[in-house]
Amino acid sequence: MALPQLSEGAISAMLGGDSSCKPTLQVINIRPINTGNGPPRYRLLMSDGLNTLSSFMLATQLNSLVDNNLLATNCICQVSRFIVNNLKDGRRVIIVMELDVLKSADLVMGKIGNPQPYNDGQPQPAAPAPASAPAPAPSKLQNNSAPPPSMNRGTSKLFGGGSLLNTPGGSQSKVVPIASLNPYQSKWTVRARVTNKGQIRTWSNSRGEGKLFSIEMVDESGEIRATAFNEQADKFFSIIEVNKVYYFSKGTLKIANKQYTSVKNDYEMTFNSETSVIPCDDSADVPMVQFEFVSIGELESKNKDTVLDIIGVCKNVEEVTKVTIKSNNREVSKRSIHLMDSSGKVVSTTLWGEDADKFDGSRQPVVAIKGARLSDFGGRSLSVLSSSTVMINPDIPEAFKLRAWFDSEGQVVEGTSISESRGGGTGGGNTNWKSLLEVKNENLGHGEKADYFTSVATIVYLRKENCLYQACPSQDCNKKVIDQQNGLFRCEKCNKEFPNFKYRLILSANIADFGENQWITCFQESAESILGQNATYLGELKEKNEQAYDEVFQNANFRSYTFRARVKLETYNDESRIKATAVDVKPVDHKEYSRRLIMNIRKMATQGV
């Protein structure tokens, strides 16, 4: 089989600023470069059949090609995207951003032809141009020549053409791609879109106090995280806006701490006293947020605390709750949503603060999250970080594809949760909806761990005998107290006597649906939801008006609720039986329940049931 024809003259064209060519080249040699603590870098000696050049650098995202021996000496490849970077000493480096191996090294006998080392600045010998060869390289500009007009059009031209930006101080800085930034550069400018901006945060410790905020930015070549401290935080916070494009110049670069971010860059930027941020009006060609989505079905194989990108349809959403952060005693909003993708798996995802308050899941939107942290608390679950980006119905192909899947078939898929319920919700992907007959037939609760399920059922009978007891009045204790018959009540757990007590409820209820019934134990909050009265009022009513007390229980019969229950096989006196406990009891959301019934009918219809 014939070998692909090399693109003779391509090296000259690439160095001359022709960023549109996609030359076919041969790898002559690969040499690793020591980068200290950073990722390995590879320098390539490549040939276009006419010349060789040793100034090719492989972008780090392509390192796996070398590591897996796909990119090796003598192989033939096509460079589909590259960037020319000018060094301080005048040398030029070609950074290979995208590359495809056309012919592996074992199928190529050796070096093709007799290429000569490229001598930058000297005219190269002419070569017959094949049909697929790139256009002739433009002639070198003299010192007094004006740059070609195309150098100011678009991001690619900015990168390849070496255009200059006048900074506020009057100096000039070359616009370079984010992917080429490293700590050894001093004068540079990137043209990038801000995709995420955090709030200003403060800190105080033994070394002092201060403030900071962070942003994430992206251009055609990649993305990077930047942080501004103290004076720079005050200076730039009001200037920088999400989704706007800016010229960023002169920041400090260091090895990135990837523990708290999913940004794909080995370095991160810190603004300093010389940093400048200038708005860019010509921004249409700068990309938006870059995602590397992980399927929900793959989360169980990922390591705990991994920060990753996720996309899913909001199958269900729970109510907002308020929690207090112990570290600063600050109250924040918290909301759990349940996301499902085409894998059929569902994961519980926690939103915080403003994201939690403003989220509307009523229309089951597609939710994309960049930089969510994976937890193993309660199976597998996700939590949004302060550095995360949450997008609702984003304008990206993955969202359109997922929406189409869900509307056509996904809405009738119940979904398998990889997150265990921790109570509080009555709907959604982790609710494990079951009829009471299914609970019995599937032997739920017979395993080593308890099982959870959600069911709509009706109260058939309430056992009011001994459902109220006198408990310790301490806030964190619900132990039954002993009446000392002297006006005091003793709690054995607290080892104290109290002049009062509080009433607590333990209510046994028999519930039923269309196919089965089940005894279930309902504690304080669940029992109060069923009876429609709090325990204190019921205790007083029992003492003063027994008939009114009985009517409360009679009125509660034959009312339907959504029960979230825990079932476990327990053994007592050598007798084993299933014990069901209500985790949560809420009124039936008939709109949601009807939607679920319709989904089940459609599902059975497609299965021919």
Swiss-Prot record:
C4-type Zn finger ranges: 472-494
Keyword hit for Zinc-finger: yes
GO CC terms, sorted: DNA replication factor A complex; nucleus; PML body
Chief localisation class: nucleus
Compartment annotation: Nucleus; Nucleus, PML body
Binding region for DNA: 188-272
Record field: compositional bias (Pro residues): 125-137
GO molecular function annotations of the record: damaged DNA binding; single-stranded DNA binding; single-stranded telomeric DNA binding; zinc ion binding
Alphabetical UniProt keywords: DNA damage, DNA recombination, DNA repair, DNA replication, DNA-binding, Metal-binding, Nucleus, Zinc, Zinc-finger
Gene Ontology annotations of biological process type: DNA replication; double-strand break repair via homologous recombination; meiotic cell cycle; nucleotide-excision repair; protein localization to chromosome; telomere maintenance via telomerase
Region described as Disordered: spans on this chain: 113-163
Keyword Nucleus recorded: yes
SUPFAM superfamilies (alphabetical): Nucleic acid-binding proteins
Assembly with partners or alone: Component of the heterotrimeric canonical replication protein A complex (RPA). Interacts with rpain-a.
Recorded family membership: Belongs to the replication factor A protein 1 family.
Task performed by this protein: As part of the heterotrimeric replication protein A complex (RPA/RP-A), binds and stabilizes single-stranded DNA intermediates, that form during DNA replication or upon DNA stress. It prevents their reannealing and in parallel, recruits and activates different proteins and complexes involved in DNA metabolism. Thereby, it plays an essential role both in DNA replication and the cellular response to DNA damage.
Protein name as annotated: Replication protein A 70 kDa DNA-binding subunit
Organism expressing this protein natively: Xenopus laevis (African clawed frog)
